[in-house]
């Protein structure tokens, strides 16, 4: 049989068994190392209501808390919800991570390290 991926689509190398987790979308069991993981950091308050809350707030330096959620997807749900795409045979060999998406008003990139 031909091999489609160098890692067989999972991160399990010397381990015999990996505990299953449930997909966030469809709740099917998928091995923890095979699941596509996505870490989402959002404001608890939606963007439209941030200004209203900050105006009404008694504390002027109050920072709104954030919501930290780790999402686990099975392969089919990750493809369906466009978290990952299927790539050509040559593009599959490219193991560099995709460019980090950073919104317009976010922190600037860190300065380069001195030699």
From Swiss-Prot:
Annotated GO biological process: translation
Protein name, as recorded: Small ribosomal subunit protein eS26
PANTHER family, A to Z: 40S RIBOSOMAL PROTEIN S26, SMALL RIBOSOMAL SUBUNIT PROTEIN ES26-RELATED
Keyword Cytoplasm recorded: yes
GO molecular function: mRNA binding; structural constituent of ribosome
PROSITE patterns: RIBOSOMAL_S26E
Family matches, as Gene3D superfamilies: Ribosomal protein S26e
GO cellular component: cytosolic ribosome; cytosolic small ribosomal subunit; rough endoplasmic reticulum
Disordered, as annotated region: 85-115
Main location: cytoplasm
Family per similarity comment: Belongs to the eukaryotic ribosomal protein eS26 family.
UniProt subcellular location: Cytoplasm, Cytosol; Cytoplasm; Rough endoplasmic reticulum
Positions that bind Zn(2+): 23, 26, 74, 77
Record PTM Phosphoserine, positions in chain: 54
